[in-house]
């Protein structure tokens, strides 16, 4: 079953390509990053040069891929999209690099997952526009150095710390994308609803934004599910009341936490006395993968002040303890009424 608040890319997101902004002007949020990128693009165009290599990092779902496509659009060049896990051999990367058109963009998502051997192919390509290919095998094999046309590499990662220093140092532009504000997300929801031809109240947009974990991808996914809910259970319009009842049915609370988030906090608070407790122990307690907890759930819980990461393990904050106690009380109260 798909996790509604998952900020990872899903197949459904492919079908909502129309929701992606195409220009910096339409791109909502990340104001400081946008201002800098706009200057870099204008300067590159005036010099008639490709944009310097760009590294975009930050939590999933914040618009790194969208921004890469916007940069290509603003530069008036083509973009080739691939990902770290998809490039399995050095030859795969060489083939991509030798087929890039002049001043075009190569976008590598999850660039931190590139194999180190493959990564080394990028070093001369990024610095000197050169790439080495080996022809033949054994003692008779020869290395030929090819010259590449000028190009821009845009790398995106959720784990900037996993990038090797030699690779990271070759990016001239490094920008972090941060979580969005409620106001920014509300604007994104309103824009998406307009594109989807979905009738929605401003208050409903704000309610969706509050529960979207600071992430546009989550906001758009909640909007699509509420569109279904409003169509089947109500008149089709998403009012504040419809949004609130739908989100409650989807078990997304006022902080944007879902059942898995609450399971993590409950385990720390009730099973381990509030912590500190190790990641592997939490994973075993709730039946979830360690990497999934660390990459998908923890960043938002830490950002919102529910969790603290210490050398001895994870610790639940007073905010988390109060929130979990409130949920338990509400569940007990509704059970007593029945």
From Swiss-Prot:
Function: The RuvA-RuvB-RuvC complex processes Holliday junction (HJ) DNA during genetic recombination and DNA repair, while the RuvA-RuvB complex plays an important role in the rescue of blocked DNA replication forks via replication fork reversal (RFR). RuvA specifically binds to HJ cruciform DNA, conferring on it an open structure. The RuvB hexamer acts as an ATP-dependent pump, pulling dsDNA into and through the RuvAB complex. RuvB forms 2 homohexamers on either side of HJ DNA bound by 1 or 2 RuvA tetramers; 4 subunits per hexamer contact DNA at a time.
A biological-process GO annotation: DNA recombination
Organism: Caldicellulosiruptor saccharolyticus (strain ATCC 43494 / DSM 8903 / Tp8T 6331)
Domain notes: Has 3 domains, the large (RuvB-L) and small ATPase (RuvB-S) domains and the C-terminal head (RuvB-H) domain. The head domain binds DNA, while the ATPase domains jointly bind ATP, ADP or are empty depending on the state of the subunit in the translocation cycle. During a single DNA translocation step the structure of each domain remains the same, but their relative positions change.
Gene: ruvB
GO cellular component: cytoplasm; Holliday junction resolvase complex
Annotated stretches, region: Head domain (RuvB-H): 254-338
UniProt catalytic activity: ATP + H2O = ADP + phosphate + H(+)
Region (Small ATPAse domain (RuvB-S)): 181-251
Superkingdom, taxonomy of origin: Bacteria
Positions bound to ATP: 19-20, 61, 64-66, 170, 180, 217
Family assignment from sequence similarity: Belongs to the RuvB family.
Descriptive protein name: Holliday junction branch migration complex subunit RuvB
């Amino acid at each position: 079953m798909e996790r509604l608040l998952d900020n990872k890319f899903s197949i459904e997101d492919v079908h909502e390509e129309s929701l992606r902004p195409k220009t910096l002007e339409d791109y909502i949020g990340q104001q400081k990053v946008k201002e800098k990128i706009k200057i870099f693009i204008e300067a590159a165009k005036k010099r008639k040069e490709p944009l310097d290599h760009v590294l975009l990092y930050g939590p999933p779902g914040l618009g790194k891929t969208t921004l890469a496509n916007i940069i290509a659009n603003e530069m008036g060049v083509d973009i080739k999209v691939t990902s770290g896990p998809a490039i399995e051999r050095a030859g795969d990367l060489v083939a991509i690099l030798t087929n890039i058109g002049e001043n075009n963009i190569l976008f590598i998502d999850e660039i931190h997952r590139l194999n180190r051997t493959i990564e080394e192919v990028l070093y001369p390509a990024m610095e000197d526009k050169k790439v080495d290919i080996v022809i033949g095998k054994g003692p008779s094999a020869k290395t030929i150095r090819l010259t590449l046309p000028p190009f821009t590499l845009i790398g995106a990662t959720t784990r900037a710390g996993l990038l090797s220093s030699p690779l990271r140092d070759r990016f001239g532009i490094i920008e972090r994308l941060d979580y969005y504000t409620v106001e920014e997300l509300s604007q994104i929801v309103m824009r998406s609803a307009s594109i989807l031809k979905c009738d929605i109240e401003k208050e409903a947009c704000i309610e969706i934004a509050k529960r979207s974990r600071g992430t546009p991808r989550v906001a758009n996914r909640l909007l699509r599910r509420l569109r279904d809910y409003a169509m089947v259970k109500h008149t089709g319009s998403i009012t504040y009341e419809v949004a609130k009842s739908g989100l409650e049915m989807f078990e997304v609370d006022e902080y944007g936490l879902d059942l898995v988030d609450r399971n993590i906090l409950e385990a720390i608070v009730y099973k381990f006395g509030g912590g500190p407790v190790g990641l592997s122990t939490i994973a075993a307690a709730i039946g979830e993968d360690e990497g999934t907890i660390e990459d998908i759930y923890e960043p938002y819980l830490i950002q919102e002040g529910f969790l603290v990461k210490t050398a001895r393990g994870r610790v639940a904050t007073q905010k988390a303890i109060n929130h979990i106690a409130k949920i338990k009380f509400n569940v007990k109260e509704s059970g007593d009424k029945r």
